[in-house]
Amino acid sequence: MNDTISWSTLAVILAAGQGTRMRSPLPKVMHPVGNRPLLGHVLAAVEAAGIEQVAVVLGAGGPMVADYLHQAAPSARLFTQHEQLGTAHALLAARGALQAHEQGCVLVLFGDSPLITSQTLSRLRQALIDGAAVAVAGFHSGQPGPYGRLLVEDGHLRAIREAKDASAEELQVSFCNGGVMGLRADSCLWLLERIGKQNAQGEYYLTDVVAVANSAGLPVTAVEVEEDDVRGVNDREQLLAAERIYRQRQANL
């Protein structure tokens, strides 16, 4: 096994979402949990994991978020997704950072997931070091209803099946897609450029990278994490839930 230290890691944080369900003029990733913006918690986890290379993809509210990043993460490279064409499209907006990072690991995070931990990031990175080309964070849920399912066979992640596309048998699977993932830098761009938009929304979905990698015969794995680690914030109710979990964690320190 290679030494973790020898694997340079780039964290790309997707923070371009419009956050319309927040019903607020404040950019979604700037809403606070524990007196810190959602994005600030993600940056803290990245720093705690020892990741020094950071790129952030901005969209709606870009100037305000950029001002915050200039203070909170002055070394981060900033990119803009000018059109909302899906998560893979957002990641490709950071092409400049991806091209400069030819070896090691690329971790893809979301700016609205304030409960992500450095341990989860380290485990995704380790999965890549251990040989996976793609590693996807997954969690077991007692109520998996709307979540995409991770279909694992003999230790390999074969597919991410969205709930609306899943068979009755697949809907019984409780292992769900956490969204956060890692990709080997040496195949990252090759995989992303082969993602199409043949779907109802006409968007480029990052989850399709699993199918592309499997078709190319590259190893794909799932890394089990706690559901709270990958819990996103899309509305006021979820913001309050994240605040409660954050306070519980702080009380348990």
At which residue positions do the language-model features occur?
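Conserved N-terminal catalytic core of the sugar/cofactor nucleotidyltransferase
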Residues: 1-10, 37-109, 115-126
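Conserved alpha/beta core of the MobA/IspD/sugar-nucleotide pyrophosphorylase nucleotidyltransferase superfamily
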Residues: 2-7, 174-253
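Glycine-rich N-terminal loop/short-helix segment of MobA-like nucleotidyltransferase
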Residues: 7-33, 49, 72
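Short beta-strand/turn micro-motifs composed of small residues
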Residues: 15, 58, 110, 138-139
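Short N-terminal binding/cap micro-motifs at the start of the first secondary-structure element
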Residues: 19-23, 64, 145
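Hydrophobic packing residues within well-ordered alpha-helices of enzyme cores
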Residues: 22, 65-69, 124, 192, ...
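Short, proline-centered helix/strand-breaking motifs
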Residues: 24, 113-114
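Conserved core of the sugar-phosphate nucleotidyltransferase
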Residues: 116-200, 207, 218-221
